[in-house]
């Protein structure tokens, strides 16, 4: 349902809440979702990965393994600086890279059925050797590596996450109390690029991200730069980067 023009689905979800609002699902041929534009931003809980999504992959790969650290940081910043409520997956705050595999504690016929079911599910995936869900080592491989947060890379990730959370608490949370319904607008989309803005009584928040391989020209984003990563952008956004701006006041546009 999201493979075709994923940037359009993401932009709409950020601006309006749901990617599908009654449109026909390409996968099922049935209507999917309901209209969400009447809801305030805090009605939506967003995540870029969770236990179900990661655990159902054959090898339990986290986003950092699939997309790389640079893209993942851009997406993490988008998650934490949008007006929706963010949900972090365990270890995401320090860049945990261990997999989160599908594991169970079943016995007898049920254990056998689950093992065979997982193998059958990925039978058409060439080269995939699915770990046994009931094997103790499958569970052990899925446990967090708490030492990683104390590594130089882990410390940098934690500092990055803390900075984003502080910015959210100081600048974005105060806007949300007066938000009564969806106030988002999709400004621009292109492969790997989106720009969205949200208008509140207290100001206009704008966000643009680029995880493509090329530089993209920015639309007009009003206000002062709240956050830019890896550096400030002037008129364009390079690959694997993000900018968030805030224009204060009810008349901000």
Tell me the role of every PLM-derived stretch.
Residues 13-33, 88-89, 94-103, 125-205:
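Glycan-recognition and catalytic regions of carbohydrate-active enzymes
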Residues 214-231:
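Beta-strand-rich binding/interaction modules
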Residues 60-67, 232-240:
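Short, polar loop/linker segments at the starts of domains and inter-domain junctions
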């Amino acid at each position: 349902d999201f493979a075709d023009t994923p940037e359009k689905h993401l932009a709409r979800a950020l601006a309006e809440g749901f990617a599908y609002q009654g449109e026909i699902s390409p996968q099922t041929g049935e209507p999917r979702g309901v209209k969400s534009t009447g809801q305030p931003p805090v009605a939506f809980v967003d995540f870029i990965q969770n236990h179900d999504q990661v655990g159902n992959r054959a090898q339990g790969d986290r986003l950092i393994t699939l997309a790389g650290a640079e893209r993942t940081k851009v997406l993490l910043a988008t998650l934490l600086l949008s007006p929706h409520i963010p949900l972090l997956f365990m270890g995401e705050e320090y860049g945990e890279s261990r997999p989160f595999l599908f594991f169970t504690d079943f016995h007898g016929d049920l254990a056998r059925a689950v093992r065979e079911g997982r193998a059958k599910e990925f039978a058409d995936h060439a080269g995939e050797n699915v770990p046994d869900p009931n094997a103790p080592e499958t569970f052990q491989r899925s446990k967090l590596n708490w030492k990683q947060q104390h590594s130089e890379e882990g410390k940098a990730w934690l500092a990055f996450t803390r900075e984003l959370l502080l910015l959210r608490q100081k600048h974005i949370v105060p806007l949300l109390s007066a938000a009564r319904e969806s106030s988002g607008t999709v400004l621009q989309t292109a492969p790997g690029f989106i720009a969205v803005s949200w208008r509140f009584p207290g100001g206009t928040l704008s966000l643009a991200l680029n995880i493509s391989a090329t530089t993209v020209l920015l639309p007009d984003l009003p206000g002062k730069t709240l956050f830019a990563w890896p550096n400030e952008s002037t008129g364009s956004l390079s690959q694997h980067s993000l900018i968030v701006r805030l224009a204060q006041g009810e008349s901000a546009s």
